[in-house]
Swiss-Prot record:
Enzyme class: transferase
Gene symbol of the encoding locus: miaB
Reported cofactor(s): [4Fe-4S] cluster
Domain Radical SAM core: 148-378
Protein name: tRNA-2-methylthio-N(6)-dimethylallyladenosine synthase
Amino acid sequence: MGDKEKKPLKYRILTYGCQMNVRDSETIAGLLEGSGFNQAEDLSEADLIVFNTCSVRHSAENKVYGKLGEIASLKKKRPELLIAFGGCMAQLPEVRQKLKKRGVDVVFGTHNIHELPYLIARAKEKRSPVFEVWEKEGSIVEPLPSCRKPGLSAFVNIMFGCNNFCSYCIVPYTRGRERSRKADDIIRELEELAAAGYKEVTLLGQNVNSYGRGLGEKIEFADLLYRANSVAGIERIRFTTSHPKDVSDRLLQAIAECEKLCEHIHAPLQAGSNRILQRMNRNYSREHYLKLVERMRHYVPGVSITSDLIVGFPGETEEDFLETLDMVERVRFDAAFTFLYSQRSGTRAAELAEQIPLEEKKQRLERLNRRQYQIATEINQELQGSIQEVLVEGPSKTNPQKLTSRTRSNRIVIFSGGKDLIGRLINVKITEAKTFSLFGEIFNE
């Protein structure tokens, strides 16, 4: 056997979508490295390219297909190149049908990531494509290897799937029903992260408030937070996402009492009109949401509240849209992720009449963003002169001569300082505020 053949194969993972996919890609990397692969510096030297995909919006799918076209032309020059395709798009039958003509060697789903090394070996042995996607979720497989990038912050899954079936959302169909990880497994992972030098963790779930249901033991999300708060070495804890319909007082009390829990709650409103909320199957009203905001600010003074907002949902009138703008005024979100409604085949909303023209959706999005950005700027300006505790993350991407850091309320703060501060919690005085970031200077009492 020649020297060339002895070299380990190299892989590259292309990740699209949410934090759940980022975490899945870390697991995929761990599985591949456990099978003898090494990570490639770039696509040109990879023997295996893995797509970990998102199907929440058409734009995400279009990016994937565009990149897949690029890789297919690369494969014509290098026929031995293997392409694996996973993530939420792989769960959709119509996508799998398209992939049969795209030069893909392995297709795997969200429920059988752990099988990837075996599927790759099968494809190489058969010299023909292997499509293996589980339609139904199985039991959670623990433990799985992981290959996280060195750093300060880490994502930790606490549950998988979703039972809410919002009418616009494909996630319950691609991620399956809710399954919670055992609390002991989660705490063990947090302890391992602390031992590896991570300072901050973000607990992930489609709806973290549902954590514990179906576990067979009496535990809810607040109980898990109290346990996580006691893990030595972890200095900050975040979580996402919270469904507004079931944020309990006990959860809010846990945020108030646990010193490591950051004062930031992402509670997606999605729309401000009760009629549209009902069509979305969100199971709460604008009045419920406003009371929730009152409760959040009562239990956690100064809490940062962020949201997702969708414009152009089928049947949304100008009056419905104005109600969303009104909620933005009333709540005054610290930040909001805003989206055009994206019609997803297989969801109930896709079958609704009165689909809104694209140009009208874009105009509404522009109006919404304009006002939300003004509010975010105003809130940030109120922080000028304040002292904020920040976790120093590293050199700023926009100005490597400065450091970037993050407040407990999840705001970016740029300041001047030495690299010895990276990884530390320090106090910074805010000197300037913009829409998406703050600027400051080290504060020494």
